[in-house]
Amino acid sequence: MQFGTSPLAHMGLWVTDLAQAKRFYVDTLGFGLLRRMQGAVFIDAQGTLIALTGPAEQTDAADRFDPFRVRLDHLALAIVDAGELAGLRDQLDAAEVPNHGVEQEPGTGATYITFYDPDGIARE
């Protein structure tokens, strides 16, 4: 059965430090803060809802993202104008966010920046 889809509606992310994740998405990336609740923050990423949830009581305090486990590999967010990527790179550099600078995918010609959130998960 086929069904119609639209762009990503929302994503939920468990984070190790809710305040740090909120600063990253709101202050560093410039996304809108929609709402705060006990243990959660809701972000508007240009029309896509990002629900950030702080660590559960059962989460080991030393738990960290491991790129070699089964996991979400990365999340790619669309940008309206590829010309804005250089400004985003400068913004990430100023905030000392690890990134690979502006790159171009050899197969598709897509231009992007890979950068990492405070938990080490890749974003494009």
Task: Map each language-model feature to its residues.
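Hydrophobic pocket/interface hotspot
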Residues: 21, 25, 75, 92
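Core segments of cupin and vicinal oxygen chelate
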Residues: 14-57
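Helix-adjacent hinge/juxtasegments
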Residues: 59, 63-78, 83-84
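N-terminal beta-strand motif that seeds the catalytic metal site of vicinal oxygen chelate
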Residues: 1-19, 72-77
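Short secondary-structure boundary/capping segments
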Residues: 3, 41-42, 64-67
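Short beta-strand micro-motifs in enzyme catalytic cores
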Residues: 41, 73, 109-113
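Vicinal oxygen chelate
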Residues: 1-4, 89-124
